């Protein structure tokens, strides 16, 4: 895939900005006791969608997501996860003052905290959950090469509180990874989800529309990547497919995504991940680089690809598009703007 000419990058960005202005409208209803947010405020973009889109199932809409949502709270003292390679653990023991900072640079995929991501318009949260060794019995955390200090129960509560302030917004929570989780811990986590979100939860079934969710006062779909647990809780949905290219180079990643599109989209909700993936060899050979710098270098090609996508029900349509550093280059706005392509002329 060839790099974009500067003039072409400008045209792509202009198209996305123009479309974004047309897909949102300020509805006549009010949210709670306050008027709906003004146009362009992405904290309430779902409630501001054109009424024509209220009856479109969520898996046919274009929805922005964040990859490895919780990595913003990692720091240099975060512990390396037990699932990481033996070489990384060895380096962590021998030269911890070097290993910690280097690993952190490649573990952090987001700079906005979870509330800021929701305010920015992100509606798919990628929650990699783990039980860290030597942690207390039920203190579940998040993981991406390193363990977070943030606890799962606190984060779910923060999300629920945000939703109470935005009663017509809908979030999709993908609970994944489950490093160190036992059957008892899965039941504990499922219980936390049910207790914290309560009637906000949309039970597993046919993918709903926004109008249906609003009528039922439901705001949360929880995808859970453990089949045994899903079978025990009606409130949990099966794992949402995530197209992961596992590629360091942007052009390789985008070719993978195009190949997946060519094979036909899944029937329900699914994610196209536009996240670059490093490996340990690459990290060791590029000690002064970082995932953020590598991601930002890839933005021109990523932007072109995103703006070319089409939501809907056709085999090559996209649904959720998730990326790293979602605050960069108007990523969220561009994904939301794709919904304009669903509007009748």
From Swiss-Prot:
Tagged with keyword Cytoplasm = yes
Cross-referenced SMART domains, in alphabetical order? PLCXc
One Pfam family of this protein, by short name?
PI-PLC-X
Q: What is its main location?
A: cytoplasm
Annotated compartments: Cytoplasm
Q: Which GO terms describe its cellular component?
A: cytoplasm
Tissue/organ expression: Expressed at highest levels in brain and kidney. Also detected in stomach, thymus and skeletal muscle.
Q: Does the keyword Transcription regulation apply?
A: no
One GO biological process this protein is involved in is:
lipid metabolic process
Protein name as annotated: PI-PLC X domain-containing protein 1
Q: Which GO terms describe its molecular function?
A: phosphoric diester hydrolase activity
Looking at the record, the residues that make up the PI-PLC X-box domain are: 52-228
Q: Which UniProt keywords apply?
A: Cytoplasm
């Amino acid at each position: 895939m060839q790099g974009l000419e500067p003039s072409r990058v400008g045209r792509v960005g202009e198209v996305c900005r123009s479309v974004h202005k047309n897909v949102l409208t300020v509805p006549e209803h009010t949210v709670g006791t306050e008027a709906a947010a003004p146009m362009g405020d992405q904290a309430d973009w779902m409630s501001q969608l054109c009424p024509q889109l209220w009856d479109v199932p969520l898996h046919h809409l274009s929805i922005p997501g964040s990859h490895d949502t919780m990595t913003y709270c990692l720091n240099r003292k975060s512990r390396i996860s037990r699932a990481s390679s033996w070489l990384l653990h060895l380096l962590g023991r021998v030269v911890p003052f070097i290993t910690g900072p280097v690993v952190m640079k490649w573990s952090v995929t987001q700079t906005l905290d979870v509330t800021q991501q929701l305010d920015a318009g992100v509606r798919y949260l990628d929650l990699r959950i783990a039980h860290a060794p030597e942690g207390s019995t039920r203190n579940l955390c998040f993981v991406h090469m390193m363990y977070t200090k943030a606890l799962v129960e606190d984060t779910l509560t923060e999300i629920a509180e945000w939703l109470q302030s935005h009663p017509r917004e809908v979030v999709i929570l993908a609970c994944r990874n489950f490093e160190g989780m036992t059957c008892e811990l899965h039941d504990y986590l499922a219980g936390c989800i049910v207790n914290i979100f309560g009637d906000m939860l949309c039970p597993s079934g046919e993918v709903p529309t926004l109008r249906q969710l609003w009528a039922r006062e439901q705001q949360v779909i929880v995808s859970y990547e453990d089949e045994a647990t899903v079978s025990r809780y009606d409130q949990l949905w099966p794992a949402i497919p995530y197209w992961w290219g596992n590629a360091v180079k942007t052009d390789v990643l985008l070719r993978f995504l195009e190949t997946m599109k060519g094979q036909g989209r899944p029937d329900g909700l699914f994610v196209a991940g536009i996240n670059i993936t490093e490996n340990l060899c690459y990290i060791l050979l590029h000690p002064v680089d970082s995932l953020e710098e590598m991601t930002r270098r890839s933005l021109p090609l990523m932007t072109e690809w995103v703006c070319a996508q089409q939501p809907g029900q056709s085999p090559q349509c996209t649904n959720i598009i998730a990326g790293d550093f979602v605050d960069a280059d108007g990523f969220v706005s561009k994904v939301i703007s794709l919904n304009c392509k669903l509007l009748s002329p």
